[in-house]
């Protein structure tokens, strides 16, 4: 086992588990997903349907995702009920499904095979070479970029990512299979299960403490990423960002353990340097220069890269994708052309509409660093005009840990409205409310107990050229349409 594993720590499950062999997709038989409508679960279900596996599933309520799965051939029930567990061989759950779930209880009683979501995804990977993208931020966009690049370069990869890719209308696709094929996966670190994929290329965009409701301490987060890198196939390559302190430390530990590492960033010390970054509306450009050795091969060159998405962070994400393409055998100019083919990912600075020159964007950011980057991009696109934000904190534990950091990030807007916390899987924590953020001393950041009032206020203040953003991992995304409606009512009455 790699030197990366030599830390004397007792970690929460499943981090203490050995790296398991992948199950065969065919041996799973008829598969039922408990919570099939989630981003990760729906992607795996889509892959299995395309592979001809009988799929059923359940969720708490009807959604567009569930309807799409039905149209693809899945049998989906709402709500969840023990009676749904029949004529199946394997049940797939995520960490969000607790032991008191009626369907899981029924599956246990029937002695059915129960797999974690990550085990099911590993089975779907089959014999493909895996590119697994992890990181506290940017993994959905970066994995989507890599999938699009490899596809446009003719590799016909399979992919499973955490967002719908523009131009593909899906978060998953079954491409070429078998030896020599590629599978691009977003590797979610939130519960430590990302050690199951055994990638040939592991991309780590950044490493910061997050998901402390699971990990409890920052040290456990860092150890989980150690395990992720150690889980690579023999001869695997770590691609990571030298600009990020946590990722840089991971790269140094990996190199000390004899693992191949290629770094990227704006730093002159990075193996691939990103420079001359400029933005033009919703597009951006940069110059990439690289010189490194990997697997006994020398890589060196310079290439201009144009993206159809804005922001410094996206140019860094693109650098990771570009290196991946080089390692897969692509020519630099072809890789750059393929990068321009990436049209964005859903809820990643996604334009929801434009009324009288006022643009409304939506973003999934839910960590202070992500919020800062989203607002930084918004500021660039606003180009001197005002930036208004409606932010919904995600999880009580995250709000408690990062309240002051959220406030500082949100102060980058001209005015930010903070809604009540979206609890997701958590119960309330005494004393933890959105007012921890709004009370941190930034005059631009305001508490909004009434979303309707915040929307009305923004619609009255915004003028042509301004940018409005809805930000968060909860249901704040639905407010974009309401904001557009208010803007229509104000500007387009006639």
What is each PLM-predicted segment?
Residues 232-238, 383-384, 464-465:
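Short glycine-dipeptide loop
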Residues 58-60, 77-80, 115-122, 160-163, ...:
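Beta-strand->loop->alpha-helix junctions that form or flank phosphate-binding loops
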């Amino acid at each position: 086992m790699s030197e990366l594993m030599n830390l004397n720590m007792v970690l929460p499950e499943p981090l203490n588990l050995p790296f398991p062999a992948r199950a065969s997709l065919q041996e799973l038989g008829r598969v039922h997903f408990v919570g099939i409508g989630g981003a990760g679960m729906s992607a795996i279900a889509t892959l299995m349907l395309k592979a001809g596996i009988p799929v059923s599933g359940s969720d708490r309520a009807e959604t567009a995702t569930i309807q799409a799965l039905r149209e693809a051939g899945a049998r989906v029930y709402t709500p969840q009920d023990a009676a749904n567990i029949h004529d199946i061989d394997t049940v797939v759950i995520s960490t969000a499904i607790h032991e008191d779930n009626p369907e899981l209880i029924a599956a246990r009683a029937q002695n059915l095979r129960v797999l974690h979501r990550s085990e099911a995804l590993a089975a779907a990977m089959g014999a493909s070479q895996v590119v697994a993208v992890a990181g506290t931020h940017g993994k959905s966009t970066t994995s989507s970029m890599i999938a699009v690049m490899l596809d446009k370069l003719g590799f016909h990869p399979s992919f499973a990512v955490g967002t719908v890719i523009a131009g593909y209308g899906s978060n998953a696709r079954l491409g070429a299979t078998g030896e020599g094929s590629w599978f691009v996966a977003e590797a979610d670190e939130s519960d430590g299960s990302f050690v199951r994929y055994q990638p040939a290329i592991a991309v780590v965009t950044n490493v910061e403490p997050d998901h402390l409701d699971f990990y409890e301490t920052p040290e456990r987060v860092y150890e989980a990423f150690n395990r992720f890198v150690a889980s690579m196939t023999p001869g695997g390559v770590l691609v990571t960002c030298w600009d990020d302190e946590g990722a840089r430390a991971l790269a140094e530990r990996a190199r000390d353990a004899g693992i191949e590492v290629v770094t990227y960033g704006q730093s002159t010390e990075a193996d691939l340097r990103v420079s001359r970054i400029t933005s033009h509306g919703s597009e951006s450009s940069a110059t990439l220069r690289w010189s490194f050795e990997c697997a006994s091969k020398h890589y060196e060159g310079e290439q201009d890269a144009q993206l159809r998405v804005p922001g410094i962070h996206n140019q860094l994400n693109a650098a990771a994708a570009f290196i991946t393409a080089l390692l897969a055998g692509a020519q630099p100019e072809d890789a750059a052309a393929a990068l321009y083919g990436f049209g964005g990912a859903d809820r990643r600075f996604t334009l929801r509409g434009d009324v009288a020159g006022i643009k409304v964007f939506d973003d999934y950011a839910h960590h202070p660093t992500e919020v800062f980057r989203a607002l930084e991009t918004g500021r660039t696109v606003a180009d001197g005009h005002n930036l208004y934000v409606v932010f919904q904190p995600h999880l009580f534990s995250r709000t408690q840990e990062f309240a002051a950091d959220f406030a500082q990030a949100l102060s980058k807007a001209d005015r930010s409205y903070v809604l009540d916390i979206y609890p997701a899987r958590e119960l309330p924590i005494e004393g933890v409310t959105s007012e921890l953020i709004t009370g941190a001393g930034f005059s631009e950041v305001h508490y909004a107990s009434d979303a309707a009032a915040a929307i009305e206020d923004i619609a009255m203040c915004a003028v042509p050229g301004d940018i409005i953003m809805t930000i968060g991992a909860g249901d704040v995304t639905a407010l974009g349409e309401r904001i557009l409606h208010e803007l229509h009512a104000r500007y387009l009455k006639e």
